[in-house]
Structure formats: C-alpha cells, structure tokens
C-alpha cells in the first residue's frame, strides 16, 4: 500500500472510530482497540496518523465542535453522525496537523463524505471546512489564492 493510500486508510479507520464513539459512547481506548482488531489491513495503515486523528479528535470533541459550529447554521445534534464525525476529524487535522496542506485535508474529508455520507453530505462538509480553513490557516489559504490568481492572469 502506498504511503498516500496508507494515510487515506488511516483516515477511514479514524472516521470509523469517531463514528463508533458517537454512537456507542464507549471509551476512546475501547474504540481504538476495536477498530485496530477489526481492520484486517491495519498493519498497512499509517498508524501514527490514525492514532493522532482518533485520539486527538476524541480528546477534544467540545473544542473542535466550537471551531466548526459557527459555520453549520443548525444545532450540532441535527447533524448526521457521519457528517459530525467527518467534521470533527477534518477540524482536528486542519488545526493540529499543519504539515498536511489544507486542500488535502478538505479533499480527504470530501472523499470520506462521498463514500460514507448522505447524497449531498460532501458539499456540506466542503463548505464548512473551506470556511474553517480560511480562519484556521488564513496565511496558507491566502497564499494559495494569490498563487491561483497570479496563474489565472498569465493565460
């Protein structure tokens, strides 16, 4: 499995863990152990990313929800558990994993929403995380926009 696929799979498994935690209320340790035991390919996953995402998200749910809640325009309780889990993971990664470009974080969240969420869930996730990235990573977002604008002017 390529390193890119190992990271994507780590995000999928972290999503499963957060989703399981939201529905079951089990401790983060129980959830982590269950996900590891159930994933037949866990030995090929980027374990460091999986642990960082799952533990970091579950240890900071309240603070992460506070970050994205201004952009959802409805009570958090009305989100589907899968959308909530994806937003929690994406918010954590935007905030605490700055080595990963914001566009990669958002794209990976969109792919998770397409694979596991409702019909238009990916659009919702994209909109929320895009606004959040502009706030959490304003320098990176502005640099990307300036580069795009400069490229558009050269045509």
Swiss-Prot record:
GO terms for cellular component: cytosol. Keywords: RNA-binding, Transcription, Transcription antitermination, Transcription regulation. SUPFAM superfamilies: NusB-like (SSF48013). The keyword Transport does not apply. Gene3D superfamilies: NusB-like (1.10.940.10). One of its GO terms (biological process) is transcription antitermination. Pfam families: NusB (PF01029). The keyword Transcription applies. It comes from the Bacteria. InterPro entries: NusB-like_sf, NusB_fam, NusB_RsmB_TIM44. GO terms for molecular function: RNA binding. Transmembrane segments: none annotated. Belongs to the NusB family. Involved in transcription antitermination. Required for transcription of ribosomal RNA (rRNA) genes. Binds specifically to the boxA antiterminator sequence of the ribosomal RNA (rrn) operons. PANTHER family: ANTITERMINATION NUSB DOMAIN-CONTAINING PROTEIN (PTHR11078:SF3), N UTILIZATION SUBSTANCE PROTEIN B-RELATED (PTHR11078). This is Transcription antitermination protein NusB. It comes from Azoarcus sp. (strain BH72). The gene is nusB.
């Amino acid at each position: 499995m390529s390193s890119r696929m190992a990271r994507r799979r780590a995000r999928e498994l972290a999503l499963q863990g957060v989703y399981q935690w939201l529905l079951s209320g089990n401790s983060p340790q129980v959830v982590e152990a269950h996900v590891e035991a159930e994933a037949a390919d866990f030995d090929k996953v980027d374990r460091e990313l999986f642990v960082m995402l799952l533990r970091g998200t579950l240890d900071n749910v309240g603070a992460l929800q506070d970050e994205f809640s201004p952009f959802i325009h409805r009570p958090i309780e009305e989100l589907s558990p899968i959308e909530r889990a994806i937003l929690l993971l994406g918010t954590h990664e935007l905030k605490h994993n700055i080595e990963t470009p914001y566009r990669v974080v958002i794209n990976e969240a969109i792919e998770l929403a397409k694979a596991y969420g409702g019909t238009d869930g990916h659009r919702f996730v994209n909109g929320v995380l895009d606004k959040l990235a502009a706030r959490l990573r304003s320098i990176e977002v502005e640099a990307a926009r300036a580069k795009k604008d400069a490229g558009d002017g050269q045509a």
